Amino acid sequence: MAMKLKDNEALALKSLKDALLQKYDVLDFRVFGSKIKGLDRPDSDIDVMIELAEYNSSIASEIDDIIFEINLAHDDFISVVIFGKKEIEEGPLSESPIYKVCKREGVSL
């Protein structure tokens, strides 16, 4: 699948990935959803799946703040789903429909 990103979207995703890599152990970073399928509209968000080595509510809050600033700076709307490695390996998340779609259809950046 070919993903077509506008310049501001590509910059926003690069900014997000760079910011996360500086602060967290990012295991996977994928774009999925309408942007990948070529079904996005001008008002569509950019769906991103992030898998971290460690994930908790404090990290979730920090990442929300990072995304908020990036969305403002680049006039985008990045929407994320975040998974922790432990929850995937030891819990039911590996069978979650959203996780399966992200792994199957998502484009790794």
What are these regions (language model features)?
Residues 30:
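His-Asp-centered metal-binding catalytic motifs of divalent-metal-dependent phosphohydrolases/nucleases
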Residues 46-50:
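Short beta-strand->loop micro-motif that forms the acidic, two-metal-ion catalytic signature
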Residues 1-27, 36-42, 52-109:
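Catalytic core of pol beta-like nucleotidyltransferases
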